[in-house]
Regions:
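Structured N-terminal alpha/beta-domain signature
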Residues: 1-46
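A secondary-structure boundary/capping signal
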Residues: 149-150
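Non-catalytic, conserved peripheral segments adjacent to functional cores
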Residues: 8, 32-146, 155-156, 161-163, ...
């Protein structure tokens, strides 16, 4: 089996998935060019998963909070917001995909976050004690976007049996130093 640092880093031969998990290599790892290493929110290896077709088409990678993502934009404008440990981009954006059965684990982000629904089934977004359903059926109470205030607990999962693709725009820009579970 070939274990590679994605996208075009060095490779090593491993006997099996257990050896791949114990390899100690850093970065996004891919096994035999098809199965991607998922790490938990603390960075510990969890296992290898094949990318769903939408994730493959958009070059999404496993997100530590669950699902699949790719940063699509980071503002070149930086500043040091009050209460933050260092400078941040003024805003960032990602694609985020959740498959049926996947969830974005409960977590907090220091910055405000706007969720924007793109395609697939509806998404249940829990913000503190409230629940919002993002989706296309606005006449039925779904909304195409929702705001999570900075510091609020949040979690998300598909509301049905379809994958859901959203974007998340974070301002001040996302930094894993501002993420907690």
């Amino acid at each position: 089996m070939q274990l590679t640092i994605y996208p075009d880093g060095p490779s090593i031969e491993v006997a099996d998935e257990a050896e791949a998990l114990a390899s100690g290599l850093e970065g996004q790892l891919v096994l035999d060019g098809a199965r991607f290493l998922r790490r938990d929110v603390h960075g510990a290896p969890v296992g290898f998963e094949e990318r769903p077709p939408i994730a493959r088409a958009l070059d999404l990678l496993p997100h530590p909070e669950g699902g699949w993502y790719r940063q699509t934009w980071r503002s070149p404008v930086e500043f040091r917001p009050d209460g933050y440990p260092g400078p941040r981009a003024s805003a960032t954006g990602i694609y985020f995909l959740l498959q049926p059965g996947e969830e974005s684990v409960p977590h907090r982000v220091r910055s405000d976050e706007v969720w924007l629904w793109h395609r697939g089934g509806p998404l249940t977004l829990t913000v503190g004690d409230e629940t919002v359903v993002l989706g296309p059926l606005v006449e039925e109470g779904q909304v195409p976007q929702a705001v999570v205030p900075g510091g609020a607990w949040q979690a998300a999962r598909p509301a049905g049996d379809e994958a859901v693709l959203v974007s998340c725009v974070v301002s001040p820009g996302f930094d894993f130093a501002d993420f907690s579970t």
